[in-house]
Amino acid sequence: MSEINISAAAVKELREKTGAGMMDCKKALIETSGNFEEAIDFLRKKGLAVAAKKAGRIASEGLTAAKVDGLTGVVIEVNSETDFVARNEQFQALVKDIANLAVIAKTIDTLKTFKMQSGKSVEEEIIENIATIGENLTLRRMDILEISEGAIGSYVHNEVVPNLGKISVLVGLASNAKDKAKLEALAKQIAVHVAGNNPQSIDDSGLDQALVERERKVFFEKSKEEGKPDNIIEKMVEGRIRKFFSEVVLLQQNFLFEPKLTVAEVIKNAEKELGAAIKIAKFIRYELGEGIEHGEKNFADEVAAITQG
């Protein structure tokens, strides 16, 4: 049987619909004699075998998502290999559905076993999407934020659709303040601040002490090289440590929306206005791909393999 002629437009349409690779889309259309719906099913049926082949490939793109349900919030990160897939509606719907379940699941291991609308588990659904989309996909991480009373603010930076983007933040404010709307507005503002300023901890005590000592040592050696007397060096080091804290400790950072005030001062003012104590119980900040080693040659190697095969 001679090979059926498949138009470039049909391949392009299938790629846009599924996010699968160009060669995979062309093969699917050839195998199904150009039937578009059957081609989609063909890609889906390849699931398990394709997932195994792609599992070793680096997935550092994708999306983070934030979801709040009352006094519970969750942030997740689902990775793909390319930004193209992150802009694919099928992938976005997958991430959104997983985030909705994550609020209930509470842990990533439990989440992977939860059933989706298709009847498949989250883990099985991801495997099927690997086949359809044509890239390695991974549910990399999730974190939960729960408070007994107060408000949770969320913010997603570089949104591609609501609540999905490159950076996702949750901030939980523990308080019995009666004006929940104002408390939620403050939590939202602090979430935006956290996205932009990337604090490492809420207060001094939350900082990794090994990191503090390393900074202290660097400041000490630098001051010593400047030939300062020991008593001056000590004061200079303490001054630099205070500056370091003001850069990485949330409560000591200058507030994004009122730069003349620290976050701690803004909270103190809000306490006076709302007539109740307010405490930052926890914040979560996920930035897409942080900590993942990017494989620069991955795509080039894949292209070479296609052209040589």
UniProtKB/Swiss-Prot annotation:
Signal peptide: none annotated. Pfam families: EF_TS (PF00889). InterPro entries: EF-Ts_dimer_sf (IPR036402), Transl_elong_EFTs/EF1B (IPR001816), Transl_elong_EFTs/EF1B_dimer (IPR014039), Transl_elong_Ts_CS (IPR018101), UBA-like_sf (IPR009060). CDD domains: UBA_EF-Ts (cd14275). Residues 82-85 are annotated as: Involved in Mg(2+) ion dislocation from EF-Tu. The keyword Protein biosynthesis applies. The keyword Kinase does not apply. Keywords: Cytoplasm, Elongation factor, Protein biosynthesis. GO terms for cellular component: cytoplasm. GO terms for molecular function: translation elongation factor activity. Belongs to the EF-Ts family. This is Elongation factor Ts. It comes from Rickettsia massiliae (strain Mtu5). The lineage of its organism: Bacteria, Pseudomonadati, Pseudomonadota, Alphaproteobacteria, Rickettsiales.
